[in-house]
Amino acid sequence: MRFSLFFFIYLSIALTNIAAQRVPPRTRPTAPDMNARAKAAAERNVRELREMEIERKTVAKDNTIVGIPPIYRKPTKEETGALEPPKEVVDKYSEFLRKQRTGVVTLNADERCGTDDGLVSAEQSCASFQFPGGGTAYSFRVESYRAQRLSDLKLAKNILVTDSFGQQGILVDLGEQPIEDLDLKSPGIHFLANFKPAESSEEFRTLSRELETGMNKDGFLYRLALIAKANHTFGLRSIAYEGQSPRSINGVAYDEFGFDRRDDVIVVFKIADIAQNGNVTIVWRELRRGDSPKIKSK
């Protein structure tokens, strides 16, 4: 009897420990999460615009400073091996990917790997992503993974966000449309193509606030952040404004925009795969590229 009592106590403790060690199921962000992301993106856009206005005349461009360029480099194929797009996606869209200005890329859903300063993350789970942005952000303007602050699109868990420094991004979910035949006149894209970029600081701030909650036009919702949905096609306009972005590393001041391509692009992309770990693979096509405007300071 005494042995049975001890055994029962031991078994109870063991089961409690096992339950405590279980990893809780991963929660998927919902509409409130998306709203929070959009709000943070809008506030960040306004704050960073203010920084550009204050400091735009203090730093000259210099892309020859030793030690700085690696932060803005394109990662090698070996470095991005852990994010190689699924073969079935590449095969399925092989004909589409033979067209000009198209591509396929897998975004890392682990936002801990995406530091905003361009440095690599020290997180153990990010050991396979030791390059700027950690695979969480992509620039269609330079066709490469990028540090988040210079990207056109980033993935935060399952939320797509466009809110880089000195950039105004607009996302729209076009539903389960085929990407192959979309053009600048397509529903949902037509608004992006005809949208007039902000010319002043006040217009920029107003637009950021509107995109925080969303702009409804012709049956489509345009926002800074949208939930990534499998098989959905999205439109994106990314306006990377001209100007200066003063930065300093180890006491050396430089203009970050000297290491970037400041263009105004319109892209369509389709979510071709969402992996079990949340990584999102997209196929994309650039529809238009032009020179970016410059915000007029007061």
Residue ranges of model-derived segments:
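Residues in flexible loops and secondary-structure boundaries
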Residues: 9, 148-150, 182, 242-244, ...
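Sec/Tat signal peptide C-region and signal peptidase I cleavage site
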Residues: 15-20
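Bacterial N-terminal signal peptides
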Residues: 6-14
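Acidic, glycine-rich flexible loop segments
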Residues: 199-277
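Positively charged n-region of N-terminal signal peptides that target proteins for export
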Residues: 1-4
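N-terminal "domain-start" segment
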Residues: 22-225, 252, 298
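Generic alpha-helix signal with a bias toward terminal, lower-confidence helices
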Residues: 13, 152, 246-248, 271, ...
